[in-house]
C-alpha cells in the first residue's frame, strides 16, 4: 500500500469532469485531495458509498477538500453508472471519477488487486503540498463510514495547520494536544502547566487556536 508521508503521484488523469492534473488543478490551488478507489461500477456496496459520499460532498468542499473517485472501469461505464445512480436514488454525483482502464494510477497507489484486476477499496488523503497524510484499505465486502472519514479529514487539517496532535475519539471543538518537548528542561517546565497531565501530555483548548487553524 502507498506509504504515509510520501508524495502523491504527479500524473494527469481522465475523469467524468474532464482531465485533471493533481498538482495544477488541486494542490496548485491550495486544496486537499481525498481520493477513494472502488472495486467496480454497478456493484451494490460501491453504489451505497457513492450515494453516501455525494451526500457529504458539500461538507468536504467547505474544508477545501476535493473528493475524487477511482476505478479501472472505462469513462463510459462511469458515466452510465452515475446516470443510473441519479435515476434510481435521486442523487447526482458531484465529484469527478477517474477512469483508469490501463491501471496506471491504481498500480502507482498499490491499489490494484492483480488477481481480480479490480481496484482495492482504499482511501488516500493528501495535503496541499502533495504529501499523503492518511491511507486506509477496506475489504471488498463492506463499505466505508463516511462520517468517520470526514472526522479523520478534519483531524488531519487541524494537525497540518496548527501543528498539534489529536487524542482518541477527537471531534472538532474538543481539546487538542501539544506535541511533547524533546529537551529535558522544557519537559520539567511543561509538567507545571495547568493543562498538563504529564510532561508528555499537555492539552490545549480548541478555542485557543487561531481561526485559520480550525475546521
Curated annotation (Swiss-Prot):
UniProt keyword annotation of Oxidoreductase present: yes
This protein's GO CC annotations: cytosol
Major subcellular site: cytoplasm
Gene3D superfamilies named in the record: Antioxidant, Horf6, Chain A, domain2, Glutaredoxin
Statement: the UniProt record of this protein carries the keyword Calcium: no
Example of a GO MF term: thioredoxin peroxidase activity
Thioredoxin domain sequence ranges: 2-158
Pfam family, any one: AhpC-TSA
EC number: 1.11.1.24
PROSITE patterns: THIOREDOXIN_2
Catalysed reactions listed for this entry: a hydroperoxide + [thioredoxin]-dithiol = an alcohol + [thioredoxin]-disulfide + H2O
Catalytic residues, chain numbering: 46 (cysteine sulfenic acid (-soh) intermediate)
Residues involved in substrate binding: 121
Subcellular compartments: Cytoplasm
Purpose of the protein: Thiol-specific peroxidase that catalyzes the reduction of hydrogen peroxide and organic hydroperoxides to water and alcohols, respectively. Plays a role in cell protection against oxidative stress by detoxifying peroxides.
PANTHER family reported in the protein's UniProt record: THIOREDOXIN PEROXIDASE (PTHR10681), THIOREDOXIN-DEPENDENT PEROXIDE REDUCTASE, MITOCHONDRIAL (PTHR10681:SF128)
Similarity remark: Belongs to the peroxiredoxin family. Prx6 subfamily.
NCBIfam families linked to this entry: PRK13189.1, PRK13190.1
Protein name: Peroxiredoxin 1
Organism field: Sulfurisphaera tokodaii (strain DSM 16993 / JCM 10545 / NBRC 100140 / 7) (Sulfolobus tokodaii)
Amino acid at each position: 500500500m502507498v506509504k504515509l508521508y510520501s508524495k502523491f503521484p504527479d500524473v494527469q488523469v481522465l475523469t467524468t469532469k474532464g482531465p485533471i492534473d493533481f498538482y495544477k488543478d488541486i494542490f496548485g490551488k491550495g486544496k486537499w485531495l481525498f481520493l477513494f478507489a472502488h472495486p467496480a461500477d454497478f456493484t451494490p456496496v460501491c453504489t451505497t458509498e457513492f450515494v453516501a459520499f455525494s451526500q457529504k460532498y458539500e461538507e468536504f468542499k467547505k474544508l477545501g477538500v476535493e473528493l475524487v473517485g477511482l476505478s479501472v472501469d472505462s469513462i463510459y461505464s462511469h458515466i452510465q453508472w452515475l446516470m443510473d445512480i441519479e435515476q434510481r436514488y435521486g442523487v447526482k454525483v458531484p465529484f469527478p471519477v477517474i477512469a483508469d482502464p490501463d491501471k496506471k494510477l491504481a498500480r502507482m497507489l498499490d491499489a490494484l488487486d492483480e488477481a481480480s484486476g479490480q481496484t482495492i477499496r482504499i482511501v488516500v488523503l493528501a495535503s496541499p503540498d502533495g504529501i499523503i497524510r492518511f491511507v486506509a484499505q477496506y475489504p471488498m465486502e463492506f463499505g466505508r463510514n463516511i462520517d468517520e472519514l470526514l472526522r479523520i479529514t478534519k483531524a488531519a487539517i487541524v494537525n497540518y495547520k496548527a501543528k498539534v496532535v489529536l487524542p482518541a475519539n477527537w471531534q472538532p471543538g474538543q481539546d487538542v494536544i501539544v506535541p511533547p518537548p524533546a529537551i529535558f528542561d522544557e519537559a520539567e517546565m511543561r509538567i507545571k502547566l495547568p493543562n498538563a497531565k504529564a510532561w508528555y501530555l499537555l492539552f490545549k483548548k480548541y478555542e485557543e487556536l487561531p481561526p485559520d487553524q480550525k475546521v
